[in-house]
């Protein structure tokens, strides 16, 4: 007995697919993704004006069989009248961190597929089993009892956007459904699936957890723990969001530093305080993730005054404790700043902190100036600035043309080239934004803002 139409409707109805032009279903050929494909197909058949359903298989080219497996998914889709595409990760493969690189490439290709067809949704076949495994993996890695990642996967995430704008939505409708239920569903339909041999290789973390502690764990106990972790994350977010409702809580100054009110910071509950400082370190440092537990503890000791040090560098950020009524300051550390080519018409992100679009005709280079180079440029322009402004310029993007320093961001008297648009980029929100944190991202963005300059 398969899932009833009412059960299928309950799984997919909350996502609002009927408003979409197209929905991309990520289908590898395994039981989870095929179960997803046929359930979402059934749901689309219930809609009066269903969107276009496109199954997309990513061939990572990591196994000799992967091409044939992707083609077999295509044959199955044709048999059932489902549109199908194969996308290939044909880049050089890294010698380490292969699983993470493959995941990043897979989502990049899926996002591009969605954008190509005007789609706003990608759906994946993550199951309740994946949720349990993810929780146990993160719990095993983390020494901090309140680790935010223990809230596990969210039903919704946003990919490759500007916070809540311009993103493609990644949806996981099957997080309440077991893998066994999906396999029973496929057997009832006479549909076979392929088991990826890497899923049985316990040298990898997830298979090791799957065939170890996840197999022995009581499912309901783990699900209750996931719910508790999710509630804790919501409490921390809510406390910080409430504090950010005060306009004095957080602002960006003219030099690009993030300024925090010390009294408001000290009044936050402990976990919300650690979250706040970790978020600002990630934003100032251009990072996609929060600092680790030990790094956030170091920040907390310095900002609380429990450490004699007034400043520290961590996670690419320089952090200074405020004194005598001055705010805490978070800004970029002067290390590992990139040099990028800014082509006409091609948006790029510089250092995880700024998004550029060159709407003109000329090419530029983007890089942070050296100390002597900056001094020479300011002297040539007869510009005098105070030391903090100078330090900020040394970690800010500058425009170069034919090897010459041409213009400086955050220097209003600089000679700016026309048609260069800049806005603030939050790597921690704009790469992947879990549904748990939608409201938090809104609150932070409301205090800091996006637009830096419209150079013309």
Curated annotation (Swiss-Prot):
Q: Enzyme class, one word? A: ligase
Q: Which GO terms describe its molecular function?
A: ATP binding; tRNA(Ile)-lysidine synthase activity
Task: Extract one GO BP annotation from the record.
Answer: tRNA modification
Q: What is its main location?
A: cytoplasm
Cellular component per GO? cytoplasm
| Ligand binding (ATP) | 28-33
Q: Which reaction does it catalyse?
A: cytidine(34) in tRNA(Ile2) + L-lysine + ATP = lysidine(34) in tRNA(Ile2) + AMP + diphosphate + H(+)
| UniProtKB keywords | ATP-binding, Cytoplasm, Ligase, Nucleotide-binding, tRNA processing
Q: Known EC number(s)?
A: 6.3.4.19
Coiled coil: which residue ranges? Answer: none
Pfam families on file: ATP_bind_3 (PF01171)
Subcellular localization is given as: Cytoplasm
Please give the function described in this protein's UniProt entry.
Ligates lysine onto the cytidine present at position 34 of the AUA codon-specific tRNA(Ile) that contains the anticodon CAU, in an ATP-dependent manner. Cytidine is converted to lysidine, thus changing the amino acid specificity of the tRNA from methionine to isoleucine.
Q: What is known of its domains?
A: The N-terminal region contains the highly conserved SGGXDS motif, predicted to be a P-loop motif involved in ATP binding.
Query: Which family is annotated?
Result: Belongs to the tRNA(Ile)-lysidine synthase family.
Cite the HAMAP family for this sequence: tRNA_Ile_lys_synt
Stated name of the protein: tRNA(Ile)-lysidine synthase
Q: Which organism is it from?
A: Brucella anthropi (strain ATCC 49188 / DSM 6882 / CCUG 24695 / JCM 21032 / LMG 3331 / NBRC 15819 / NCTC 12168 / Alc 37) (Ochrobactrum anthropi)
Q: What is the lineage of its organism?
A: Bacteria, Pseudomonadati, Pseudomonadota, Alphaproteobacteria, Hyphomicrobiales
The primary gene name is tilS
